[in-house]
Amino acid sequence: MTRTLHLAEQLIARPSITPDDAGCLDLLAARLAPLGFVCERMDSGPARQRVSNLWAKRPVAQVPDAHDASKTAVKTIVFAGHTDVVPTGPLEQWSSNPFLPTRRDGRLYGRGASDMKTSIAAFIVALEEFLAATPEPRIALALLLTSDEEGPSVDGTRVVVEQLKARGDSIDYCIVGEPTAVEKTGDMVKNGRRGTLSGRLLVRGIQGHIAYPQLARNPIHQALPALAELAATEWDQGNEFFPPTSWQISNLHAGTGATNVIPGEMVLDFNFRFSTQSCAEGLQRHVQQLLERHGLSYELHWTLGGQPFLTTPGELLQAVEQAISAETGLSAALSTTGGTSDGRFIAHICPQVIELGPPNASVHKIDEHVLLTDIEALKNIYRRTLENLQAQALAAATMPA
């Protein structure tokens, strides 16, 4: 058994359903401390829903920038991940206990096998191998781990980022270990994500008997033209990195349950997934103006889940793409599709954020799994990425002014 597989199995065996870390961070901190990492717990949230957060950084001597004495030449690379997992679903539908890591048919089965405990294990072992070969690197190494990514994402990475920003800790590069591959580890890298903006709309009517519509006001009938217009709106055309912004209804509630009562109100939940061609403020303004134009009596509450972010080609993508090519022979596709991740918080303090992990076909599913070969390939890609960033740092140090 490889060290990566062994650590992955240790993590999967801990039933860390959000926000319970189930001891994962203690295990990882014990692994990082001998490598010279200073481990800080930044736990947050109410006692009954306490979120576990770990910030671990390996100090490195600061070297003045040869071209700008006011800056340092040492860059910081952060691995960001989450130890929490989603609930298992019906246990009887699993082929094996989801928290008893099981190997069969060349795969590792268990909740978190793909999302994302194998990514964490792969990066830890990649660090160990990298530091064994390069005990005094010219890059600073750090990890940001939380047990609140699959849940509200209020007391996890967001809190750590705020604390790092407040004390002036800088991050230059970040790899988020989310499962990004389509078929084989390395075939896709996420170099950005769309923003997410949710709204809850309450449309007020007047309840009444369905046989006397003249004595009532049906909020569903009133809202339908506005909803049709929202659904038909072209918000933007996207760009070379992002598809067009989309607006979707997720829930619609109205009525008393009786078939002879006109409802007094209608409640609608909707969501925008928006590109860098749009902004949250502009989308909010458009929706509110449209509702006013349709003469609705309404209340509208907004929740901004995250702004879009994009990492254009630079040092990190170059290091990652070279690592993937050397390890797998693949030319990674760059994509911004899919849901959101904690990268949306880290992008506030880090200019280069990418996501790289194993295939995502089984995430959140019954019998979640990952190929054993993908686990080792991911570890090697992470290690090669660190080696490439180290080579870049050495080259920059010797470059003439």
UniProtKB/Swiss-Prot annotation:
EC number(s) given by UniProt: 3.5.1.18
Protein's pathway: Amino-acid biosynthesis; L-lysine biosynthesis via DAP pathway; LL-2,6-diaminopimelate from (S)-tetrahydrodipicolinate (succinylase route): step 3/3
Please tell me where Zn(2+) 2 binds in this chain. D115, E150, H364
- Keyword line: Amino-acid biosynthesis, Cobalt, Diaminopimelate biosynthesis, Hydrolase, Lysine biosynthesis, Metal-binding, Zinc
Q: What does this protein's record comment on cofactor binding?
A: Binds 2 Zn(2+) or Co(2+) ions per subunit.
Q: Which Pfam families match?
A: M20_dimer, Peptidase_M20
Cofactor(s) required, per the database record: Zn(2+); Co(2+)
The reactions it catalyses are:
N-succinyl-(2S,6S)-2,6-diaminopimelate + H2O = (2S,6S)-2,6-diaminopimelate + succinate
Q: List, from the UniProt record, the residues annotated as the active site of this protein.
A: D84, E149
GO BP of this protein: diaminopimelate biosynthetic process; L-arginine biosynthetic process; lysine biosynthetic process via diaminopimelate
Q: Identify the CDD domains for this entry.
A: M20_DapE_proteobac (cd03891)
Q: Does the keyword Amino-acid biosynthesis apply?
A: yes
Tell me which domain of life the UniProt entry assigns to the organism this sequence originates from.
Answer: Bacteria
Residues binding Zn(2+) 1 are H82, D115, E178
Q: Which InterPro entries match?
A: Bact_exopeptidase_dim_dom (IPR036264), DapE_proteobac (IPR005941), Peptidase_M20 (IPR002933), Peptidase_M20_dimer (IPR011650), Peptidase_M20A (IPR050072)
Which molecular function terms from Gene Ontology are attached? Answer: acetylornithine deacetylase activity; cobalt ion binding; succinyl-diaminopimelate desuccinylase activity; zinc ion binding
**Function according to Swiss-Prot or TrEMBL:** Catalyzes the hydrolysis of N-succinyl-L,L-diaminopimelic acid (SDAP), forming succinate and LL-2,6-diaminopimelate (DAP), an intermediate involved in the bacterial biosynthesis of lysine and meso-diaminopimelic acid, an essential component of bacterial cell walls.
The family annotation for this protein states: Belongs to the peptidase M20A family. DapE subfamily.
Its subunit composition reads: Homodimer.
Identify the NCBIfam families for this entry.
Answer: dapE_proteo, PRK13009.1
Protein's UniProt name:
Succinyl-diaminopimelate desuccinylase
The species is Verminephrobacter eiseniae (strain EF01-2)
